[in-house]
Amino acid sequence: MGRKKIQISRITDERNRQVTFNKRKFGVMKKAYELSVLCDCEIALIIFSSSNKLYQYASTDMDRVLLKYTEYNEPHESLTNKNIIEKENKNGVMSPDSPEAETDYTLTPRTEAKYNKIDEEFQNMMQRNQMAIGGAGAPRQLPNSSYTLPVSVPVPGSYGDNLLQASPQMSHTNISPRPSSSETDSGGMSLIIYPSGSMLEMSNGYPHSHSPLVGSPSPGPSPGIAHHLSIKQQSPGSQNGRASNLRVVIPPTIAPIPPNMSAPDDVGYADQRQSQTSLNTPVVTLQTPIPALTSYSFGAQDFSSSGVMNSADIMSLNTWHQGLVPHSSLSHLAVSNSTPPPATSPVSIKVKAEPQSPPRDLSASGHQQNSNGSTGSGGSSSSTSSNASGGAGGGGAVSAANVITHLNNVSVLAGGPSGQGGGGGGGGSNGNVEQATNLSVLSHAQQHHLGMPNSRPSSTGHITPTPGHDKYEGYPYRALMGHNPRWNLNFAGAPSSDQDVRLAAVAVQQQQQQPHQQQQLGDYDAPNHKRPRISGGWGT
């Protein structure tokens, strides 16, 4: 198609005339530049527009060219518009540089017949595609792909030979040339169509050249086989009752199967790995990419009649750890047989549970954890005369009825009724004066003159302890030693704080609940008994 030529006449429209002027003015100057460079000449171009505006171009210097023009007296060529028109008419209207009159583009009968023929061919092609796919569907454009694949969902019992005739046409006319090997081997998109009476399996939009169980698993077209189509024999009852399954299966990048697994475990492992992909569907196809499967042979008894697994079978599969084996990019390998592969039984994994260590909660919160896991809440340890009952389902707590703290000696008198077991029973023990006397064995009047390195004096004159590490924490004889004098010390003559009372009450509860906890603990959970080193690390 050549350029549209216009008639050389004055342009009446103001806007069109201005646009044409600017365009052709630049064209004339460009031609002058090309002529000056190519032919080594001097050019001076002077243009006055219709609005009396001056535009000039000079290849070198305009004044020098004009001076040279005025001083030139020899005969020379001088042309006007009349001379140009005469020259163009002499050369003919077919000259490449000469314009011609504008011709009207009318629709001739020949052109109209040509367009009608193109439309008819397009309609015939669309009708052939609809007849080839059985008339039940329309061509469907796959996203992110360079080819169009007609997909139909036939009604059960209404398909016939026309379904089988669709695959050669699809493989020859509707599929673009094969993509590069890097795109194919990296794991592309596979479209698996399961009609009610036949199975058409295509990977990356191309049919397999041979059986997938033998040789290379990479799909590709072959000279002799244009499609891979296998017919599954079914009873008339199963044909009417079974609906067609149409799925787009995207094989994920899976890791190789460990070498110590058997053939059924390989199938179950690959099925489970595919069920963990982003396709959330209750029907899972068993056309699964399984690496290193060519060395196994399956018999007729290894396959079930149905080719899908329900959601209960998927949920029964045990979860494998994702980091067992490294990931690798494998090509798609589909298992095609007269019947689909089976849904194998899951592999049971037993993990031995180690027993938990006994709880050791020595905080002065008034709550104690029993060996059976229930918590019994005791009364306030700082109250002078109170009874505490155990929490629901737990062991009983012990109340400190009479707690007396002396100024110069830390001695505790614990006595009163036993705690009532809540829920499951288990009452506490009665406190007596002997237990209180044992708590004050290590207490002495000179304790208050000792200082601890981690303490800092408070504003009231007390030494506020900084919690440190107690090497006797958690042992059975810890309650026999009483509270650690390094934890809470007062200056001589200073009144004792409430923390002494709480620590003494907790020590009584620890001592009285220790026999009850020892009876419930087994040989494995019981802590080790060691002889207490009373003299080590304690000041006198």
UniProtKB/Swiss-Prot annotation:
GO terms for biological process: anterior midgut development; antimicrobial humoral response; carbohydrate storage; cell differentiation; heart development; larval somatic muscle development; lipid storage; locomotor rhythm. Residues 3-57 form the MADS-box domain. Residues 58-86 bind DNA. It is found in: Nucleus. The modification Phosphoserine is found at residues 95, 98. Keywords: Activator, Developmental protein, Differentiation, DNA-binding, Myogenesis, Nucleus, Phosphoprotein, Transcription, Transcription regulation. Expressed in all presumptive mesoderm prior to the splitting process that generates the somatic and visceral/ heart mesoderm. After the subdivision, it is found in both the somatic and the visceral/heart mesoderm. PROSITE patterns: MADS_BOX_1, MADS_BOX_2. The keyword Translocase does not apply. GO terms for molecular function: cis-regulatory region sequence-specific DNA binding; DNA binding; DNA-binding transcription activator activity, RNA polymerase II-specific; DNA-binding transcription factor activity, RNA polymerase II-specific; histone deacetylase binding; protein dimerization activity; RNA polymerase II cis-regulatory region sequence-specific DNA binding. Disruption phenotype: RNAi-mediated knockdown in pupae results in smaller muscle founder templates that display a reduced number of nuclei. No effect on the initiation of myoblast fusion. Residues 207-217, 370-389, 509-520 have a biased composition (Low complexity). Residues 162-191, 203-241, 332-396, 415-434, 507-540 are annotated as: Disordered. Transcription factor that could be a key player in early mesoderm differentiation and may be required for subsequent cell fate specifications within the somatic and visceral/heart mesodermal layers. Essential for myoblast fusion and consequently muscle formation in adults. During embryonic and pupal development, binds to the enhancer of the myoblast fusion gene sing and activates its transcription. PANTHER family: MADS BOX PROTEIN (PTHR11945), MYOCYTE-SPECIFIC ENHANCER FACTOR 2 (PTHR11945:SF534). Belongs to the MEF2 family. This is Myocyte-specific enhancer factor 2. The lineage of its organism: Eukaryota, Metazoa, Ecdysozoa, Arthropoda, Hexapoda.
